[in-house]
Amino acid sequence: MFRGLVNAPYFTLLSDTSELGLCDISVEGKLIAGVFLRHGFKWGTLEGEKQGRIICAKGAHMIVENHALWGEEPTEEYPATFTYLGAEPLPDKPNGRRPAVIICGGGAFTHIALHEQDPVAFAFLDHGYQAFVLNYVTSDTGDVSFPHPQADLAKMVATVRANADEWHVDPKRVCVVGFSAGGMICASLATQWKTGPFAGLAGARPDDIRPDAVVLGYPLLDFAYVRDMQTRDPRIDLRVPKTGGKTGRDLLNDYLSMVTGDEATDEHLADICPTTHVSRQMPPTFVWGVSDDKTAPIAQVYPFAQRMAEEGVVCEMHVFDQGGHGLSLGNANTAVDNEDKQVAVRPWIRLAFRFLERHGF
């Protein structure tokens, strides 16, 4: 475990010396270099043994910890890790406890998009939350087939509650936030915390893994819908260069088999679709997406929202007119393509905070 202590939730890591530096930091020979401002976070790594300075504003202490999720160290079978970003107890709150947020970035289950992790965590930290960034299993690190990533999130929720005293967390206010593939993981837990296999896999009771609220950004919810949309493209049967003669259809089937652990039959795809399992046992859920998203089409989110409304789930949904996919906060620090198009989605986090506040956060 790496642990660092700095003097505020706003800090800058620089590779040069500074009169304002409070402490040095390096992790396993790599300097984590970054700039955090109120509206976002840019970061990278500098190779070598260089030391960096953490420059802080005055304020409450901030704690940064990196942990293996399933034991003392990550293993080949259980590779998931998480980072805890926390602040000191609130003196004016009962027991000084804060709400917790668990961040699940997207990345098509092959990796985790960094711009959907730390920037979002810091935004929630700025709003009074203790933040946890989950590095769930991906195809880069292990078996990504259902329900392994979902089990990681279930374990994360249970871990936050089990360590609520140490991390100054209110165990009755644990929110999960997911983007794209991470949104599917969060939606799966929200819909199947009681009926699915996740509690048993996490070694916990169902109540221990139930999130108290859910925020989903452009979630991937329905593999069958995405498959059907992609197979309508007439280019699907053309050979793709540098793939050993595989066609687009071959690659799509390979991907679906990777994430489903099956032959991707209609029945299996429906069974792992969160929409199939929507019930009134779901926690309050906030979901947003973009009408021009070609990767996780908004049309596959509408049935999910409709089912929630039919079941009486507390829910709120927002659809923005443009931005594409992978937007994160939609600001200059998280823009992955056309920043001008992403301006439209920036209000989502303010709307989400208001939703959460209305429901006990």
Each model region followed by its residue ranges:
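Catalytic active-site module of serine/aspartate enzymes centered on a nucleophile-bearing elbow/loop
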Residues: 335-361
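Primarily recognizes the serine-hydrolase "nucleophile elbow" in alpha/beta-hydrolase
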Residues: 158-233
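N-terminal cap/lid segment of alpha/beta-hydrolase-fold proteins
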Residues: 59-95
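Conserved alpha/beta-hydrolase "acid-adjacent" motif
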Residues: 294-300
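Catalytic nucleophile-loop/oxyanion-hole region of alpha/beta-hydrolase
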Residues: 112-114, 134-171, 342-344
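Short beta-strand/loop motif that positions the catalytic acidic residue
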Residues: 287-289
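Short beta-strand element of the alpha/beta-hydrolase
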Residues: 97-106
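Mobile cap/lid helix-loop segments that gate and shape the active-site cleft of serine hydrolases
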Residues: 225-277
